[in-house]
Amino acid sequence: MSKLILAINAGSSSLKFQLIRMPEEELVTKGLVERIGLKDSIFTIEVNGEKVKTVQDIKDHVEAVDIMLDAFKAHNIINDINDIDGTGHRVVHGGEKFPESVAITDEVEKEIEELSELAPLHNPANLMGIRAFRKLLPNIPHVAIFDTAFHQTMPEKAYLYSLPYHYYKDYGIRKYGFHGTSHKFVSQRAAEMLDKPIEDLRIISCHIGNGASIAAIDGGKSIDTSMGFTPLAGVTMGTRSGNIDPALIPFIMEKTGKTAEQVLEILNKESGLLGLSGTSSDLRDLSEEAESGKARSQMALDVFASKIHKYIGSYAARMHGVDVIVFTAGIGENSVEIRAKVLEGLEFMGVYWDPKKNENLLRGKEGFINYPHSPVKVVVIPTDEESMIARDVMTFGGLK
């Protein structure tokens, strides 16, 4: 019996949704509500491949969900709201409390709220979505899917910072990692494509978009990842610095007269590719600029690729080798150039890749870019976090 599952990603003023038929993983419709709580909110829904857009004031997330459900009925996507069997909600931070997805109860809601200090920009917004759906669809399972959960299998030696140990015990200061739902999806898909049990594979997953993280996945479990206590750590990103020497923060404060909050804002929003190039956080713009001879744009691309390259070497060492390297997310799926730069010189590790295959894989295409004889396989997999969310609703919502 097929089930209709809603995969939800709620922001403070937005609500992204996908309605998925399970277990077929067939997309029924998707859409977005923008500018919730502001004038002229925008509601967009896909009907028969066409986007239908309406502009109206939407005061809060409850009203946004109401409008979405009405649109489902108006466009004959469902006959009745009881046709929806479950909802899955992306929650950015599950701390140490949630090592896997969980059916939402009042108690779980309270715990997600308590974890808001670890993700003050995201968890409160995710909760708004959860509360709206629980209010309007009270009789179906609602499941929380945490970005951090997949990385809860990391050993202490990977997640502890070399700080006074009581900081970890008292304040929860440790590496948590993010993009877990994506890393989990592509690692499972890589095993399927190779027709091998995931338990037998050492996978390095490169989720490279405007935000980027690398994960070492040994036997299907995350044993290390590049993001840390927050998504600011790790590799260079669109506007985020990635790892820097922590002593730079007081140094920059002293030199510029800025507060710690202002420096943090710069590290999050004015650094990375944007900071290095001085022109854009968008890799496509920088590639064009580099081609036309802009040295700084080229330098930004080189730094960006070099950091990812370094993590691949590091994680291969952590797992005593690697069987598969996966590229996913906006840049990982579409940038022929970045994949080439990242893979350059990895032959010593058994990575032999085919430039022609690399050039052919973009715009949502899936496939291998290694030569057949390459001991290490290299694969491009478009991520599908929504399908992963829907799978977890089936499992943890008791719908299987």
Curated annotation (Swiss-Prot):
Needed cofactors: Mg(2+); Mn(2+)
Organism name: Staphylococcus aureus (strain NCTC 8325 / PS 47)
Keyword Kinase: yes
Binding site residues for ATP: K16, H207, I208, G209, N210, G211, D282, L283, R284, G330, I331, G332, E333, N334
EC number from the UniProt entry: 2.7.2.1
Active site location: D147 (proton donor/acceptor)
GO biological process: acetate metabolic process; acetyl-CoA biosynthetic process
Function: Catalyzes the formation of acetyl phosphate from acetate and ATP. Can also catalyze the reverse reaction.
Entry's cofactor comment: Mg(2+). Can also accept Mn(2+).
Any Pfam family the entry gives: Acetate_kinase
Binding site for substrate: R90
Name of the protein this chain belongs to: Acetate kinase
Residues carrying the site annotation Transition state stabilizer: H179, R240
Reaction equation(s) it catalyzes: acetate + ATP = acetyl phosphate + ADP
NCBIfam families named in the record: ackA
Subunit architecture: Homodimer.
Subcellular location: Cytoplasm
SUPFAM superfamilies listed in its UniProt record: Actin-like ATPase domain (SSF53067)
